[in-house]
Amino acid sequence: MIFKSFILGNLVSLCMKIININSVVVVGLYYGFLTTFSIGPSYLFLLRAQVMEEGTENKVSATTGFITGQLVMFISIYYAPLHLALGRPHTITVLALPYLFFNFFWNNHKHFFDYGSTPRNSMRNFSIQCVFLNNLILQLFNYFILQSSMLARLVNIYMFRCNNNILFLTSSFVGWLIGHILLIKWLGLVLVWIRQNNYIRSNKYLVSEFINYMARIFSILLFITCVYYLGRIPSPFFSTKLTETLKKEQQKVEDEDIETVNQMPPLGLEKREQEQEGSNIKDFYYFSEEMVNLNNNKIDIDETEKKLVNGKKDELYPRLKITETGYKKIPIFEESSIININENPYNSRFKILNKKFEKKNLLIKEKLFVNLIFDKNRWNRPFRYIKNTHFEGATRNEMSQFFFNICENDGKERISFTYLSSLSFFLEMIKKKINSHKLEKALTNKLSNFWLYTNKKSIKNFTDEFINRIEALDKKFISYNILETRTRLCNDNYTKEYLSKKYDPLLNRSYQKTIYINLSTPILKKTPTINLIDNFGINRIHGILLSYTDCQEFEQKIKRFYKKQLSTEIVDLLTFISKVVIELGPDSLNCKIFSDVKIIKKFLLYLLTQIVTNVNDPKIIKKSTRIKKICKKVLRWSYKLITELEQQSGEYYENIPIDHQIRSRKSKSVVIFTTTKDNTDSNLYTNDQADTDEVLIHYSQQSDFQRGIIKGSMRSQRRKIFNLNLFQANVHSLIFLDRIKKKPIFFFDISESIKLIFRNWACIGKGESFKILKYTEKQTKREEKKEKNKKREKARIEIAEAWDTIPLAQVIRSCVLLIQSTFRKYIILPSLIIAKNIIHILLFQLPEWAEDFREWDKEVHIKCTYNGVPLSKTNFSINWLTEGIQIKILFPFYLKTWNKSKLVSSQKNLIKKQKSNFCFLTVWGMEAKLPFDSPRKQLSLFNFINFVKFGKLNKKFIKLSKETIKWVKKKKKDYLISNQIIHESLSKNPSLSWINYSFKEMDLADQTSKILNQTERISKDKKQVTIKIFNILCENKINYNTKKRLEKWKILIRKSERIIIKLLFFFKFFIERIYTNFFLSSINILKINKEIFIKLIKKIIDKSIFNNERKQELINTKNKNPILFISKLLYNISNSKKNSYTFYGLDLYYVSQAYVFYKLSQVLVSNSYKFRADLQHLINYNYKRIPPFFKPEKKDFLKTQGVVDLNFGDKKFKNYAINKWKFWLREHYKYSLSQKKRPILISEKCRTVHWRNIASKKNNRYDLLSYKILNSKNKTKTEFFLNKSSSQKNNKQEIFYISKNIPLKIFMRNIHIHKKNYFNNNIKNIVRFGTLYMEYIEKMANRKYFDWKIINFLSKKKIYIETFIIINTNKNQNNKIIFNKDLYYFIISEKNISNSKKGFFYWMKMNAKILNHPIFNLENWFFPEFILLYNAYKIKPWFIKNKLLFINFTINKNSSKTINEKKGPTGREDLGSVLILSQKKDIEESYERSEKEKRKKQYKNKTEAELDFFLKRCFLFQLRFSDTLNKRMINNIKIYCLLLRLIDPRKIIISSIHKREINLDIIPIRKNLILTELIKNGVLIIETIRFSRKYGQFSMYQTIGISLINKNKQQTNKKYQDQIYFSKKKKFNLLFPENILSFRRRKKLRILICLNSKNVNDIDINPIFWNEKKIKKNIQVSYDNKNIDVYKKKLIKLKLFIWPNYRLEDLACMNRYWFYTNNGSRFNMLRVHLYPRLKFYE
């Protein structure tokens, strides 16, 4: 039985019963279901709780808050205070915006209020409470995604209609709840599908990334809502306020009224005085809304003074003090025919005044803040401003055409048309003051009897009307009584006269008009009344309202008309007119009759609708000729606003605002005429000229939706808009769809298609049924031209208006036009002229420089207005950026292939030139005839080049085509002749020899003919060229020198024939030069990074400052012969420029040092190396000998330059000392490598701020170091050594400058590593520095000396860093390393952990397990106590300065002297003894350290090495765990690294615990870890690092370093310039520029001398002809050996003196890259990376 009740039929019947019984439930459900689609900002938090998976508690709190918020919104519909609080926009501005911004910042910092989860009392958790409040509060704000204004209107309408409002609200809430549940269920299904997807489940970290992205999206959406609300309603405090000009005038009038009230006599005396004065009353008006407003101080209801009215004791009314206010004559705007109530304070006649002003003023002061935020009149401006000749002031938004209120009709309350809402409000105030019990008793009996009487009366009137209509039909009269009557407004109860249609508000709007009737004299004579001109009565409603008062002067005397007599006359008149119309017809009737009838009708209606009062009454309006109409004064603001046009025209001279406040339509003022006037001022006796302009305002044709809107007003969102087209400029509503001329999208006109079909049939068919008009060709062309011109004009107007509509478009366009004009005038056209003339020169034709530049000078650019009117430079408009400009080009330049001779041109050509005399410049740099016109065609550079290239080819092609045509014709003739019947021969096989012989003859004949033709053509061309030149010379009448020039020209022509043969090779060389010098450099320039560009600018500025300082120092130094010295320098510079090699087209800043060495080595071979490869290629591959076209002079020149030898064998290189560098660099040159192993060369990134600060502090220290290095000549130790292997198996040389105490950082710092491929095979040889260094320093090194931060670990792929360092002793057996201890610092002695070779780099295997996330900064999570110490470690370096910095305090000074005296080098072979000394010192110093290292524990496991690196990477202390915890702790640390970057790491921790990735036994439960307990238990072993030893040198260095820090980077301290030590034995007779220069310049000088190789007596050290027996192993480059020839000593001194002669350009190349660096100017001879700016990808 229960199941049967749920059958579908029963459910349907139940629903039908509900619908039939009460439709409120259905409508409420429908409305509630619709509200689910009006999505608000609270949905963001609800979706966030569902998607972000914050737990069930958060989800439940979000849903409950959301539902309660929606319930409050539904209750606010029924409950008025909530509706006022939530529906006003003030709540959004004051409450919503701060709350939304707070939520936005709170969601960005999620853990701000997160105090942890408490499972027992979850409601006490603050985070859950915040989720509930967010969903509750944000639900109360207005919706923003889907507009709910239509739904709100439906609710308001239905709430008036339905009786059971509570049932409607509950049903709507239930409907919304159903829709909400369906929405949440659908969202849950989507989320379940996402979670169960296999792809998402397979990726572990995809969910965490998705959560991160969703959190960002929610925060962005929340920020958008904040911005949306902020733009929708302006802020109350920062918006511009209106200047209340009218309020000030109103206040003056009110002050005058108060004075009249205080001096007011009694009513009787006032009447007498007014009668005597003859004062006139113009209008009577009643209470307005502003009278009731508390701010106006008008209300005073005195409860003590009460008086009986009309002799009735039951009804009590308060006594009202009524006064009259005098005012000016102001016209009244008659808009609608409602009760004539004036809302303007000017026209108010009755004002209720207050006695006590003090209390009201206090009340106003208390409510200032409330009115500021919740002001009834609103703080901001209205939306529109209605204004005409009769009316000014902004209209209130609350005002409407009709007012509705609840009134009683037939004993029932119904909505009907009533008076203003202000009067109802005033009536409610009166009712509160009167006793309600007495009022109800008095009105109950009256109301019931009154409604019964009215019902009976209406029935009687209906029956009488029906009888009268039947009688009128029987008589066949066309009268008014025949028609059916309707409800109209009655004017008088006695006469039963009604208002006319013009004054009846219940009729349509079209009848309501303002009509002024001027009564003529003949009509006035016919009227029964005599005093109609002087006396007219006031409106009946005023009399009704004034009848309640006890004032006798307002009693009315009604003059009655006899209705029967007047009605019979009217009926007779109408019947007479109808008969005339029937008999004669409407056409024959005279118009004068109708005109007279209309006047009579109006006059009679006027008589019927007026009531005459007492003639002797002083309040009668005299001398009035207008009919008063019932009108309604619209509520207005007291602001006086003006438009932009009014402000410019200056109509308002008094009380003009500073700025216009109403937005006018977008327009442009076009100046038509300007006049100058002389203004004389009598007071000042000065004459001033004032310019007056006649301006024409041009409005754009496009729609402007902002016109008429007041600045700062609230913008209403446009609704009810229908788009007809894809792109629609104007907004249309569906109501006005019939008025649109445009056709809709899918509109199809059938008639036009039918016409086209029949027209085609008529053309095809022979019949003449359809005659088509035939126009002449001229007429059709004219029409087509007109249509084209019209289309072009329309297009121009549309483009011009489009520029106006786009914001800031005119500014951009005007700037672009100015740029285009300068670019055209000074860049494009001169470059075209240059290109043209260069092509002429290349083609051996005369250039036309003068003619082209003369025409270029004629082109003038004139700035015009936006419409194209030219302007002078003085009268240029100030607002040209906003208004827009045009640029007119007079005599535009056109590039011509040949400038013809100036002959007399025809009239047609002159007319054409005049037409094309000017043009307008477009934005794209093109030319147009008119502004915004389509650009015309013009000859571009490419067209010119194509014309030049293919001009002659076209001529040749035409000639060849003519010849081929002739040949084809001949062949045809021969074929016709030879096409005869040929009998078969007897021999079937003819002889083949004949056929071959004939073919050979034909070929030879063709070839000979072609050669003859070519020779003839060449001779003809020569003759033509010579004749042209001769004619040109004759025309110009050149002197005798022209003959010589002609002869030279003939010689050039002969030489051109030879060059034509060589053109192929010339173009080949030319293309290669362009490619190497132009394209490569341009590609490189485009790849410059921004950071490098900024760094370059900074360094250039620093360099210029440095050079200026050095120049001043050089000037101040004493120089015996400065003039001779400078002259020699200049001479040497000029010679060096001629003979030296320069890098063409390359930016020297980005050339690596190794590349510079390589190029220098190539330069030393020959100065003409640039063309050497091309010439050798030509010689070897094409000719195998010197080409025949080379003259003997050229051959000798090539031989002298060393490009070509007679034997063409392997030439021996010239003698120079840099050969080792060249061969080493040639091995490692990047082009010799394979493409797979080619390095990925990326631009070097700027160093971090930390390293820059260190570099700035170290700069002066490195200057000191460089000074010690360069001034160490007196020592026996050598500075530079070139080391080579004794064996020649591999024929390779490796040059190292390695000291024992050099940190590995110096070698590895400049290795640039790409993210994808860290260490390629091409860097292996370079990395051997590190391996060799590690092997020779006790076979063990500490990881702290290597700067691992240089390597970029941010790769996403697996990295195999094991290839970085190759520990293989076999590869380095042939290399002999020499250590020099004096060049670099000595390192702090520290403990090494293990002696195993794998222990140092084996940690890098953990990089194979790097996941797709970066390695994070782990310095803050483990032990925060070590952060300060770690920062201190960053600042302090691991090594201190070398002993060379402190000469007075050297260790083992005496021992070194004795060794040097006993075992000093005697020759070149003895130079290696210095190496043995340095090795012995190293062994002695490292002995103590090796003993300490043996005592330490060594790591055996890989995990220990990994952990040790991890801890040393991040902390200052060395932390080690016990052996049992190593593996588990490392796994935990890896997971911690992942969790640090996650927003919500809780769930990943849980999943990792389930997977047993994290061991909870290791993690301590306590919140605060105690280090002492961990150390006691043996979990952690903390070993402090031993700090550096503080010797005397160290303290002295610190004191000196403080004074050097504050100096500039390029400055050097003058104290150290005095500490130059010279040997006492040596005497310098010659002035050395080396001693005058600074430290850095000396370094450059020394190395330039080392690079010099121009010595005749030097040994040839070419490896091909090298002999080991003749040459010593260690060659000294700095020439410090005593056993050097005297000749060489003199040569060295000469080189030192004239050092600029040697590689000045090379010095410029090496200046930046090698020595002069911002990071400390380290003395690194090698910069490893080649071409840092190029990028090569595999």
UniProtKB/Swiss-Prot annotation:
Q: Which Pfam families match?
A: Ycf1
- Keywords, alphabetical: Membrane, Plastid, Protein transport, Transmembrane, Transmembrane helix, Transport
Q: Where in the cell is it found?
A: Plastid membrane
Q: Where are the transmembrane segments?
A: 25-45, 66-86, 89-109, 126-146, 174-194, 210-230, 1059-1079
Record GO cellular component, one term: plastid membrane
Taxonomic superkingdom: Eukaryota
Coarse class of the protein's main subcellular location: plastid
Membrane topology per record: Multi-pass membrane protein
Entry's Gene Ontology BP terms: protein transport
Role description: Involved in protein precursor import into plasts. May be part of an intermediate translocation complex acting as a protein-conducting channel at the plastid membrane.
Instruction: Please describe the quaternary structure of this protein.
Output: Part of the Tic complex.
Record's family? Belongs to the TIC214 family.
The protein's name is: Protein TIC 214
Q: Which organism is it from?
A: Epifagus virginiana (Beechdrops)
Tell me the name of the encoding gene.
Answer: TIC214
